[in-house]
Amino acid sequence: PDTSSATTITLSGSSASASGSASSNVKVDGGTVTISGGGTYVISGELSNGRIVVNAPKADVRLVLKGATITSSDGPAIDIQDAGNAIVVLAKDSKNTLTDGASYASGQEATAALFSSDTLTVTGTGQLDVTGSYKDGISSKNGLIITGNATITVKAADDGLRGKDYLVVESGTLTVEAGGDALKSSEGDDETKGFISLGKASITLTSSDDAIAATTDVTVKDTTLTITAGGGQANATVEEQAPPGQE
């Protein structure tokens, strides 16, 4: 993406600084960096104990991780609490690491190292290593979409990737090691949701429970899939067909 007009957030140990066009939307309080407005934010450096919080209702927020290492001791590394459209971009040739705490401070909705209350898209061509020490690795309370040509590795105490409404892995390389389910979509009140769709990606799943756990359908199309699961390969029928809307 064009980041020439982006706001730069530089992480440095237990603090951070922001510069650029929308830096007024960035508040730094110790190790907590809160983004309150739309725009593109390029994040680099290392945060030894802190998190990125997005609270920008109805705004389009793009977080470009460009060599970012974020470790939180008592919550998520990235917590997208409210946004109209949330995208995490893994910059070309970058290596990024997100690690959450094994226990969270009380009153938090988040359950994952990379958490979003709204639909979340993860894209780009860089590398992302996620350790979900508390529960999940990457989780969205709505939909979760993995696209681009990124290399993503997730280790999670519970579920690896969880999109409550749906989980779509369109492309890229994904490796998941999960104490619960590797890939999960759990919405059960709407029959058009709760599905998992896997496209032209290379996916390796190791899980103590199900590798692929969907409430409704699992579709697999041109996917290179390697599974080692304790609870079985999937709890839904796996069909070789195009995902919804892509026939």
Predicted feature locations:
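A composition-driven surface/loop motif
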Residues: P1-E247
